[in-house]
Amino acid sequence: MPTLSMFYGIIIRMYNEKGGKHNVPHIHAEYQGEEAVISLENVLLEGKLPTSKLRLVTAWIEIHKEELYANWTLLSAGEKYFRIDPLK
């Protein structure tokens, strides 16, 4: 699964899920063995993260929403993704 970004111990990944169980554009955020699936509209679809880390991820999604949608389109077409700047 392509790693788009990493910040504050959080790993953000996205991959092509054509026909997958989540039918909306989303990312996977991992932190210390926990994982959450979050839509690009900031809806928690599955899993969990500590509240403070979830807030960081949702802020990052808002900042980079256009880039995330661009990556979703690229990955859905089987093309190469690009990395996105971490939260600073």
Where in this protein do the model-derived segments appear?
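Intrinsically disordered, low-complexity boundary segments flanking structured domains
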Residues: 1-2, 25-27, 70-71
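Short, charged, low-complexity patches
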Residues: 50-54, 58
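Short, charged/polar N-terminal "headpieces" of proteins
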Residues: 1-23
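A broad, low-specificity signal marking well-ordered, structured residues that form hydrophobic/aromatic
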Residues: 12, 36, 82
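C-terminal structural segments of small proteins and small subunits
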Residues: 58-88
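A short, structured beta-strand/loop element
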Residues: 15-51
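Generic structural "secondary-structure junction" signal
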Residues: 6, 40-42, 46-47, 51, ...
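A generic short-segment signal for beta-strand/edge and adjacent turn/coil regions
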Residues: 5-9, 29, 53
